[in-house]
């Protein structure tokens, strides 16, 4: 597994590469623009070229763009839904400009309408984003959820239904968040639990759909349905869980991205990256 983190890209998108290298990352994720506004982020060819050049000269192996927080691809509010689809399409366009490998998106909540109506809206949203992508190799990764408030993608069966809804388009993949898995009731702390989770994923979605992991410890208990990230080893998952995860052959060659609060509360930091690198190297 390649260890990385969510990094800042302010002051010039190419600085995301510099910030990742400074943290000791082998992979990075960042927001294309402000995560709390609808304003689309498009890059000049000069800035995009500078980003691609910086990446080529760095040890960064994977680049992911995370969509904005506002997105709800299952929203029952038509205006909000249209803005969400537009934002998803914008992220695909930005990723293609920069040569990013994939975008990661939260799916959203059906807001009480039920899973099936929500699924139909997600299907339409993904279809429009994929149409916009055309022949681009950029993949759209659906992130699982902890399970609160009617959120979509709480288990592998729901994620599989979304993949099936777009006829198994190979450009649709998964980003699994370890904290969300645990908080939704998936045991990852024991070898048996981790193996069962991997088998469940393979039986429903297929392991080939897994493109990225978000490596976050959890402040809340197994099955809490409460999304609260914690620094690696400081939460209910603990170091042994992450030692298993970063060294498991099923995840070999995949990027593992930290989204933890960081020791100073300012986001992922070098110490959390180094913890995971040490675990991958066999330290306990």
What are these regions (language model features)?
Residues 1-67, 71, 75-93, 282-284:
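N-terminal pre-domain/capping segments
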Residues 2, 156-284:
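Histidine-acidic metal/acid-base catalytic patches
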Residues 16-19, 47-54, 87-94, 118-129, ...:
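A general structural detector for well-ordered alpha-helical segments in enzyme core domains, enriched
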Residues 57, 73-173:
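Active-site acidic/histidine proton-transfer and metal-coordination neighborhood
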Residues 18-25, 44-64, 91-99, 130-137, ...:
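Acidic (Asp/Glu)-rich catalytic clusters
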Residues 6-10, 33-35, 67-70, 108-110, ...:
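Active-site beta-loop-alpha junctions enriched in small/polar residues
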Residues 39-47, 75-87, 113-125, 150-158, ...:
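Alpha-helix N-cap and loop-to-helix initiation/capping positions
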Residues 20, 66, 84, 95, ...:
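Conserved, mostly hydrophobic/aromatic
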């Amino acid at each position: 597994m390649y260890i990385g983190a969510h990094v800042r890209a302010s002051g010039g998108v190419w600085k995301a590469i510099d910030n990742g290298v400074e943290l000791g990352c082998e992979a990075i994720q960042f927001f294309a623009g402000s995560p709390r506004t609808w304003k689309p982020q498009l890059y000049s060819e000069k800035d995009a070229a500078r980003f691609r050049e910086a990446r080529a000269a760095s040890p960064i192996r994977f680049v992911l763009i995370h969509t904005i927080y506002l997105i709800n691809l299952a929203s029952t509010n038509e205006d909000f839904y249209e803005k969400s689809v537009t934002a998803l399409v914008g992220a695909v366009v930005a990723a293609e400009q920069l040569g990013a490998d994939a975008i990661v998106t939260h799916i959203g909540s059906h807001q009480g309408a039920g899973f099936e109506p929500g699924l139909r809206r997600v299907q339409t949203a993904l279809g429009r984003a994929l149409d916009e992508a055309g022949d681009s190799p950029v993949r759209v990764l659906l992130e699982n959820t902890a399970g609160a408030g009617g959120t979509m993608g709480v288990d592998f069966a729901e994620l599989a239904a979304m993949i099936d809804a777009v006829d198994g388009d190979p450009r649709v993949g998964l980003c699994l968040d370890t904290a969300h898995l645990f908080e939704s009731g998936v045991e990852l702390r024991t070898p048996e639990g981790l193996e069962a989770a991997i088998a469940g994923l393979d039986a429903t979605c297929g392991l080939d759909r897994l493109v990225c992991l978000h490596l976050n410890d959890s402040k809340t208990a197994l099955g809490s349905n409460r999304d609260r990230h914690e620094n690696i080893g400081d939460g209910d998952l603990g170091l042994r869980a992450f030692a298993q995860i970063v060294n498991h052959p099923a995840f070999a060659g995949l990027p593992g991205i930290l989204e933890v609060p960081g020791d100073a509360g300012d986001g992922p930091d070098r110490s959390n990256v180094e913890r995971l690198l040490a675990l991958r190297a066999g330290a306990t």
